[in-house]
């Protein structure tokens, strides 16, 4: 959903580890494995974080513009290594031309590539949204399934994308969305020591009440964009400054 930042000219961008622009990582498990009970201190830290985020961002929600579950599914696939702002610029025309899975499944790949080129990794993304649309038509009657395993079986859909769609559109807490911001903030706040998105998600699922999973991600993303930015975070403005250990933050 969020980009890790711009890269210098001539420097190659690497795709996300857990869910790439090309789709799911072949090593990505269907769901995080159960872990031993978390440390009470970590649970207390998570409780503090949830409380402050609720106060700061009570109305936080998914920033990807959409009218249907299908549109959110496609927009989330496009958001890999791309900002939500850019995706929201691209999708109105994309969905005007191909509003549903049947129309998108029939679209020529070359036309899809041209329509989404500015989102990056457009060759793979175009193939994925076309194949995903075809899968929805063939397997689910053109409807987005309300099932995690069925979603991640579709082309280009990993746990992050599935969690976004299920949580945002259907109110189903199937996991914690871990994007660039959630991963960065979780490490800085000492909620995880992991760098892999699936492992971070497992840690957060252990620490957070299930009822908080969906909103927690939205609020962390808002905070990561506005305050706890990647470089030179605005710690003096942060409501969590007093209890944040600032792991990895350089003075």
Question: Could you say what each language-model-derived stretch is?
Answer:
Residues 1-40, 250:
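Polybasic, lysine-enriched low-complexity intrinsically disordered terminal tails
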């Amino acid at each position: 959903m969020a980009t890790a930042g711009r890269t210098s000219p001539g420097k190659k961008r690497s795709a996300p580890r857990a869910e790439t622009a090309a789709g799911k990582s072949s090593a990505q498990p269907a769901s995080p494995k159960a872990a031993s009970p978390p440390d009470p201190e970590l649970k207390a830290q998570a409780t503090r974080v949830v409380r402050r985020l609720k106060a700061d961002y009570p109305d936080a929600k998914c920033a990807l513009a959409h009218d249907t579950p299908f549109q959110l599914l496609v927009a989330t696939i496009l958001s890999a290594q791309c900002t939500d702002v850019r995706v929201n610029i691209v999708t109105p025309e994309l969905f005007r031309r191909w509003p549903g899975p049947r129309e998108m499944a029939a679209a020529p790949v070359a036309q899809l590539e041209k329509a989404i080129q500015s989102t990056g990794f457009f060759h793979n993304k175009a193939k994925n949204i076309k194949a995903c649309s075809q899968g929805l038509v063939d397997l689910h009657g053109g409807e987005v399934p309300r099932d995690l395993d069925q979603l991640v079986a579709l082309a280009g859909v990993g746990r992050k994308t599935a969690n976004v769609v299920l949580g945002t559109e259907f109110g189903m807490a199937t996991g914690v969305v871990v994007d660039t911001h959630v991963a960065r903030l979780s490490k800085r706040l000492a909620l995880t020591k992991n760098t892999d998105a699936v492992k971070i998600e497992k840690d957060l699922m252990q620490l957070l009440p299930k009822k908080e999973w969906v909103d927690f991600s939205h609020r962390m993303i808002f905070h990561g964009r506005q305050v706890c930015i990647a470089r030179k975070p605005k710690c003096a403005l942060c409501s969590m400054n007093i209890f944040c250990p600032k792991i990895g933050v350089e003075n």
